[in-house]
């Protein structure tokens, strides 16, 4: 039995703006259960004596000198935009529905 309900999967799909059929909701509920089980198994194995890591090898940043250079004119950039308002790109609102 899945611990993920089709209602939960439908809510996640809605947040991601993905339309799913009822069959897909059922399928993804099962797939999410498999993923959650795998994460639970890893959590059981990882002990307090194992240090947390984000990369298997050490990483260092390679910085370049911050040199001022000419940039594009705002008008030129906005001229190629599909829509602009008040000197800025105008885009459709996507947040605030939930």
UniProtKB/Swiss-Prot annotation:
Its EC number is 6.3.5.-. Keywords: ATP-binding, Ligase, Nucleotide-binding, Protein biosynthesis. InterPro entries: Asp/Glu-ADT_sf_sub_c, GatC. It catalyses: L-glutamyl-tRNA(Gln) + L-glutamine + ATP + H2O = L-glutaminyl-tRNA(Gln) + L-glutamate + ADP + phosphate + H(+); L-aspartyl-tRNA(Asn) + L-glutamine + ATP + H2O = L-asparaginyl-tRNA(Asn) + L-glutamate + ADP + phosphate + 2 H(+). One of its GO terms (molecular function) is ATP binding. It comes from the Bacteria. It is an enzyme of class 6 (ligase). SUPFAM superfamilies: Glu-tRNAGln amidotransferase C subunit. Disulfide bonds: none annotated. GO terms for biological process: regulation of translational fidelity; translation. Heterotrimer of A, B and C subunits. Belongs to the GatC family. Allows the formation of correctly charged Asn-tRNA(Asn) or Gln-tRNA(Gln) through the transamidation of misacylated Asp-tRNA(Asn) or Glu-tRNA(Gln) in organisms which lack either or both of asparaginyl-tRNA or glutaminyl-tRNA synthetases. The reaction takes place in the presence of glutamine and ATP through an activated phospho-Asp-tRNA(Asn) or phospho-Glu-tRNA(Gln). This is Aspartyl/glutamyl-tRNA(Asn/Gln) amidotransferase subunit C. The lineage of its organism: Bacteria, Bacillati, Actinomycetota, Actinomycetes, Micrococcales. The gene is gatC.
């Amino acid at each position: 039995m899945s611990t993920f309900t089709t209602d939960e999967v439908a809510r996640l799909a809605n947040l991601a703006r993905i339309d799913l059929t009822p069959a897909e909701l059922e399928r993804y509920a099962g797939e999410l259960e498999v993923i959650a089980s795998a994460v639970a198994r890893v959590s059981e194995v990882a002990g307090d004596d194992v240090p947390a890591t984000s990369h298997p090898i050490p990483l260092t940043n390679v910085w370049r000198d911050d040199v001022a250079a000419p940039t594009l004119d705002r008008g030129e950039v906005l001229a190629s935009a599909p829509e602009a308002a008040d000197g800025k790109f105008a885009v459709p609102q996507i947040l605030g529905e939930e």
